[in-house]
Amino acid sequence: MFTSTLLAAATTPLQWSPTVGLIIIIANIIAIAFGKSTIKYPNAEPALPSSNLFGGFGLPALLATTAFGHILGVGAVLGLHNLGRI
């Protein structure tokens, strides 16, 4: 009886699709734009090889903004999946 209750509560897993990738990319762009305006020392050492290509960010700022973007993106993807939109 307990097993049937667990099976009834199980959700369908979300498969990766280009829509999921696009949501993660958009979330990363938003996070980088947010980081560009709020990080106090965006060009802290160690520097990236072509800092102009990365918006003048150093390695710590780039890692921080992309990590934040992935957190935002995963939250958006899981929320939209829970709502049944994707």
UniProtKB/Swiss-Prot annotation:
Keyword Transmembrane: yes
Topology term for the membrane: Multi-pass membrane protein
Transmembrane segments: 14-34, 57-77
Coiled-coil stretches noted in the UniProt entry, renumbered to this chain: none
Biological processes per GO annotation: photosynthesis
InterPro entries documented for this protein: PSI_centre_PsaK_sf (IPR035982), PSI_PsaG/PsaK (IPR000549), PSI_PsaK (IPR017492), PSI_PsaK_bact (IPR037101)
Intracellular or extracellular location(s): Cellular thylakoid membrane
Gene Ontology cellular-component terms listed: photosystem I; plasma membrane-derived thylakoid membrane
Keywords assigned: Membrane, Photosynthesis, Photosystem I, Thylakoid, Transmembrane, Transmembrane helix
This protein's record includes keyword Transmembrane helix: yes
Top-rank lineage group of the source organism: Bacteria
Assigned protein family: Belongs to the PsaG/PsaK family.
The protein's name: Photosystem I reaction center subunit PsaK
Native organism: Nostoc punctiforme (strain ATCC 29133 / PCC 73102)
Gene giving rise to this polypeptide: psaK
